[in-house]
Amino acid sequence: MGSTDLNSKPHIVLLSSPGLGHLIPVLELGKRIVTLCNFDVTIFMVGSDTSAAEPQVLRSAMTPKLCEIIQLPPPNISCLIDPEATVCTRLFVLMREIRPAFRAAVSALKFRPAAIIVDLFGTESLEVAKELGIAKYVYIASNAWFLALTIYVPILDKEVEGEFVLQKEPMKIPGCRPVRTEEVVDPMLDRTNQQYSEYFRLGIEIPTADGILMNTWEALEPTTFGALRDVKFLGRVAKVPVFPIGPLRRQAGPCGSNCELLDWLDQQPKESVVYVSFGSGGTLSLEQMIELAWGLERSQQRFIWVVRQPTVKTGDAAFFTQGDGADDMSGYFPEGFLTRIQNVGLVVPQWSPQIHIMSHPSVGVFLSHCGWNSVLESITAGVPIIAWPIYAEQRMNATLLTEELGVAVRPKNLPAKEVVKREEIERMIRRIMVDEEGSEIRKRVRELKDSGEKALNEGGSSFNYMSALGNEWEKSWKTQRSERSLW
């Protein structure tokens, strides 16, 4: 519960789907609403019983405690999905089944929310807000190009014959950069798979909200945001206002149990360390792990590598088990690797305090899976990226970073399609850390860092969008109070 007087200020309700990559940006949005708008916020999260890292993130996020967090028990969906169902399908079905519990929980609140905000996988709960007569919004913690593709998919579905990945030409989106076949999001890889029909539905449901919040900022993608608002382009598809209110990212608090990593970084020269992490759910094959180990060693650069057990399945195999697994990884590296890199690199099992590492001046480049949270953490820290997309919309993110923004380098071929060899890994690292090209990339990412800070500061674009939303919610709340609407 927020304030003692239940009618003293507006309340906003947020709904987060499972997974740290979804929970973290929702937590940050909640904190932004509290600190900028001075509202009370309740976050409903669908927890994951298998994620050991989740409690650590929650403890860190709520210091100091700004939002009320209520966990909804995840429903048992085992009888509703195929055992081999994709992560996307599991999330869509799980969030569909959570609707009765979410509706009951919101109805049981002692206050009437001024607005309900759901994340990308929670769009079916927009109907709950509609039934309760509450303003409804979607929060997409990704970039504008991804939103453009998502809401345009129902039209592409009619225009494109056969599989998207077999098209010879890039798919055109009005007013936006075309999407090449190798860039499409995972649900578009197979139109016969359930995750495609779920994604198709998403494209229809997003424009039914009263507005779309995005964890990015206007100056990062001005052309795409222009297209989303112009009725000659995507405005006729989006239909509702789009509010870029980012870049919202975690702030570095107490480092917890991994302070020795920061102690080690303190001893390294400025911008000398390669940080390697594939996000909260990304995994590599054993063959790729070995090649990456050799590439790091051959580059002759200092590094921190967050390692998970290799997988023989998809690259998102650790999505529901973030932070879990065995700590002993020695059997997965080249013989003698851990001995040879003792004075040069650190291998960290499972999880690391990423926001602390990214904020450290010794870090010179981030070898990343290009999940949007990690992208924002890198840009806002002024750190260049080696783009290594694995799943979801990460291929689109990698293209945006390398070809549009010029703040990253990437392998010639997709890591999800074939193993990236040690020689290419070595070259990519040295391009950033040693070659003149790295200085130019570092300059551009620092300019974006400044741009993001400007957007968030008073008078900036993201500040103004968030303030406008707050004013809208407060006006609605005051109207409800004056009408003494019952709850």
Swiss-Prot record:
Annotated family: Belongs to the UDP-glycosyltransferase family.
Alphabetized InterPro entries for the sequence: UDP_glucos_trans, UDP_glycos_trans_CS
Record has Glycosyltransferase as a keyword: yes
Coiled-coil regions, chain positions: none
Cited Pfam families: UDPGT
Residues that hold UDP-alpha-D-glucose according to the record: 354, 369, 372-374, 377, 393-394
GO biological process, any: anthocyanin-containing compound biosynthetic process
Binding sites annotated in the UniProt record for an anthocyanidin: 22, 392
Protein name: Anthocyanidin 3-O-glucosyltransferase 5
A Gene Ontology molecular function term of the record: anthocyanidin 3-O-glucosyltransferase activity
UniProt-annotated catalytic positions: 22, 119
General function of this protein: In the presence of other necessary color factors, this glycosylation reaction allows the accumulation of anthocyanin pigments.
